[in-house]
């Protein structure tokens, strides 16, 4: 059970910078193929006129992740344990998550591994296949340790590479402030004739909606942020203690002073999650500017990994090979960061789901073994079945995406509202509950999300 320790005094002022970190892992994970490929392609087709889509998509998901982390700070348990407390039949919400996320985790890593292999092979003299194995084995080893600080160090380094690589290109091809600022005004530009001739649909929403949906990741990314908050030891969470529900007896014993400390930690979560939204927005906009400044003038709208590869080639021809190399390096870092996040996050998520839904599993294995069993399974299922044998279970991929976008994410926002405003207040004494109850702003943001 957690927490069974005293609540640390939260840092204030500039000292808060010393404990920021979950946001780095969160941002590095969710900046993946959607940002590298979709944002660049949309920039090629629409220019910078739809930057508002990036901001909207990331902001709505940010609100879900930040609000879920607020619950974790105040209780010490992750988002999946919160879902187990939903009113109704026992663990019904967790069963939904277990089925849907098991499908996604079993096959999704393989597609990122494929894209990563293509990127790495453009930087090093290795084949696409070998490149995919290299980056995925690296991500597997980072995740295997199971400790937050190691993941944080690796992700921080990858974020720095992303910033350097993407901004180098974006600054050189920057469209000017007037055109740039127009991109923040909601508008739907028409598909240009040259793009229609290349097979792009005449319905702009077919290009825009995937970008909107992938902004800041999917359902799992927001759950994982609560794990990174636990890893950092914010508030009531015990550092790197996973796989345990909140200690209800201890929560009932919280004093007024401890509740005020938790409010301080909640503010740190607001600051930390804001770092994630700023990083994600700036880097994704950087990819869009690169597409608008390099591919659009050449009237090119490639798809898949070819978007970044062709952009790098064209940039190298015009402005030198250093920028083209850095752009590919930034794209590779983004995909590797996503792999690390997925292989560190999904095993935690599924281990929690199985622990709650099948208690015998938790009695038989300690948390680290549970985590590593799922990690090994997802590594093998993706790399052998999906990646090496080139099997793409299209129906499962589409089903996973459909469940995530149309079912899980709206339910996630609803469940967090219930968790914050109905479940959490019952865990404390009335005077403590009154202090920790979130204001109406969080609820409004979740309803919009």
Give the positions of each predicted feature:
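Transmembrane-helix boundary/entry motifs in multi-pass membrane transporters
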Residues: 10-12, 47, 74-103, 123-128, ...
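Flexible loop linkers connecting adjacent transmembrane helices
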Residues: 2-5, 38-41, 66-90, 118-120, ...
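Loop-to-transmembrane helix boundary motifs in multi-pass membrane proteins
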Residues: 128-134, 322, 354-389, 442-446
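Extracellular loop-to-transmembrane helix junctions
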Residues: 14, 41-66, 83-84, 89-93, ...
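C-terminal membrane-solvent junction of multi-pass transporters and transport-like membrane proteins
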Residues: 157, 352, 362-374, 398-449
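Hydrophobic transmembrane alpha-helices that form the core helical bundles
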Residues: 92-124, 335-355
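Juxtamembrane transmembrane-helix boundary signature
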Residues: 26, 53-86, 97-103, 108, ...
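Hydrophobic alpha-helical segments and their helix-loop junctions in multi-pass secondary transporters
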Residues: 160-200, 208, 218-227, 411-428
């Amino acid at each position: 059970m957690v927490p069974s320790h005293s609540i640390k005094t939260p840092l204030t002022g500039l000292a808060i910078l010393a404990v920021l970190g979950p946001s780095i892992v969160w941002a590095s994970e969710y900046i993946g193929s959607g940002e590298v490929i979709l944002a660049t392609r949309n920039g090629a087709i629409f220019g910078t006129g739809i930057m508002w889509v990036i901001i909207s998509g990331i902001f709505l998901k940010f609100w879900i992740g930040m609000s879920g982390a607020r619950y974790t700070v105040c209780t010490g348990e992750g988002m999946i344990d919160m879902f187990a407390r939903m009113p109704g039949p026992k663990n019904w919400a967790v069963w939904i998550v277990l089925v849907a996320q098991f499908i996604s985790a079993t096959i999704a890593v393989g597609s990122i591994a494929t894209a990563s292999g293509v990127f790495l092979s453009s930087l090093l003299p290795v084949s696409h296949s070998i490149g995919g194995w290299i980056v995925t084995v690296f991500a597997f080893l980072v995740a295997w340790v199971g400790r937050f600080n190691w993941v944080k160090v690796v992700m921080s380094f990858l974020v720095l590479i992303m910033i350097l690589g993407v901004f180098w290109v974006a600054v050189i091809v920057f469209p000017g402030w007037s055109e740039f600022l127009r991109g923040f005004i909601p508008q739907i530009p028409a598909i240009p004739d040259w793009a229609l001739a290349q097979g792009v649909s005449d319905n702009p929403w077919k290009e825009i909606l995937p970008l909107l949906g992938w902004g800041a990741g999917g359902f799992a990314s927001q759950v994982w942020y609560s794990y990174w908050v636990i890893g950092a030891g914010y508030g009531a969470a015990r550092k790197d203690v996973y796989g345990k529900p909140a200690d209800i007896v201890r929560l009932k014993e919280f004093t007024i002073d401890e509740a005020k400390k938790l409010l301080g930690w909640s503010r740190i979560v607001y600051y930390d999650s804001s770092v994630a939204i700023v990083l994600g927005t700036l880097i994704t906009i950087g990819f869009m500017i690169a597409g608008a400044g390099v591919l659009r003038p050449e009237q090119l709208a490639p798809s898949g990994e070819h978007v970044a590869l062709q952009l790098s080639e064209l940039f190298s021809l015009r402005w030198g090979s250093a920028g083209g190399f850095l752009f590919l390096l930034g794209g590779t870092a983004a995909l590797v960061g996503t792999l690390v996040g997925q292989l560190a996050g999904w095993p935690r998520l599924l281990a929690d789901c199985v622990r709650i839904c099948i208690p015998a599993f938790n009695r038989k294995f300690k948390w680290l073994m549970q985590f590593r069993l799922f990690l090994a399974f997802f590594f093998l299922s993706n790399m052998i079945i999906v990646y090496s044998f080139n099997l793409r279970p299209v129906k499962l991929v589409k089903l996973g995406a459909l469940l995530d976008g149309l079912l899980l994410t709206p339910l996630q926002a609803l469940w967090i509202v219930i968790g914050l405003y109905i479940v959490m207040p019952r865990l404390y004494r009335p005077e403590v509950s009154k202090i920790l109850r979130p204001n109406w702003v969080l609820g409004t943001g979740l309803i919009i999300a």
